Amino acid sequence: MKPKISFNNVVMRYGGFLALDRLNLDIADGEFVTVVGPSGCGKSTAMNIAAGLLQPSGGEILVGDKPVTGPGPERGVIFQQYALFPWLTVRQNVEFGLSVAGMSRVKRREISDHYLSLVGLTDFADALPKALSGGMKQRCAIARAYAAAPEILLMDEPFGALDALTRVHMQDQLLDAWSRERRTVMFITHDVDEAVYLANRVIVMAARPGRLDQIIPVDLPYPRTEAIRLSPEFAAIRNRVWHAVYHQQPQTDQQSSHGQ
C-alpha cells in the first residue's frame, strides 16, 4: 500500500541555519501519527512543509503520488491558536469553507449539523466565538477542518493552551471523530502522554538539525480509555518515548533539568 504522506530527504534551511536534515518518513492512509522531540527540532517546520505553507530547501514531500507545492483542499490544518472568525457564529465558522466553495445552503447545513454534533457543539451553533471556552473554540476548529472533507489533518499542538482536564477531554473527542472517519492525522505535541494516548505510532525527532531518530509503535487497542491510560502497557510505551525524547535534548538542557 502506498503511503498517504511521504517525506523524502526533506531539507529546510533558514539562511545558514539547518532546521531539517534529510527527513524521511512515510505515513499510511488512515494512520494517526504523533510527532515529538526537543524544542527546535523542526516538528512544526515539517508540518508546515506538509501543509504547503513552506517550501523545502531540498528533497520533496508527496501526498499520495503528487508533490506538495502549496496548500490544497485534501489537507486540513489546525493550529494551537483557534483561528476562528470572531464575527461569525460557530455554525458560520464551520460552514465557511463550504460557502466559499459554492455549496448550497441546505447541504452546508446538513454537513455542519453532523460535525457540530460530532464535537458536542450543537447547542452552541448560533453562539459567537467570544462566548466559548478554549476547549469549545478548538472543537469548533476541528469541526470546521472535518467539514471541508480533507483526506489529511495536520495538527500543530492544538491542545497546548488548554488546561489538563480539558485537554484529556479533547483527546477523547478527537479520537472519537477519527475512529468514525479514519482521516490520516499528523499531530505535533510536546506532551509524551498525549503522543502515546492518541497514536498508532510515535515519531521521535532528533535534536537540531531535525531528523528522524526513531519510530515507536503503540500496540494498544482502540478505543483508548482511561483504563488504557493507567495500564502497565501504556506506562511502558510512555517511558520508552520519554527516554527517547530526553536523550535528544542538548546536554546543557539536561543539566538544567537536574538543577545543575
UniProtKB/Swiss-Prot annotation:
Task: Kindly indicate whether the keyword tRNA processing belongs to this entry.
Answer: no
InterPro entries according to UniProt = AAA+_ATPase, ABC_transporter-like_ATP-bd, ABC_transporter_ATP-bind, P-loop_NTPase
Membrane topology per record: Peripheral membrane protein
Output one GO MF annotation: ATP hydrolysis activity
Q: Which SUPFAM superfamilies match?
A: P-loop containing nucleoside triphosphate hydrolases (SSF52540)
Q: Which UniProt keywords apply?
A: ATP-binding, Cell inner membrane, Cell membrane, Membrane, Nucleotide-binding, Translocase, Transport
Q: Where in the cell is it found?
A: Cell inner membrane
Q: What domain of life does the native source organism fall in?
A: Bacteria
Q: Which Pfam families match?
A: ABC_tran
Protein name as catalogued: Putative ATP-binding protein BAB2_1147
Native species of this protein?
A: Brucella abortus (strain 2308)
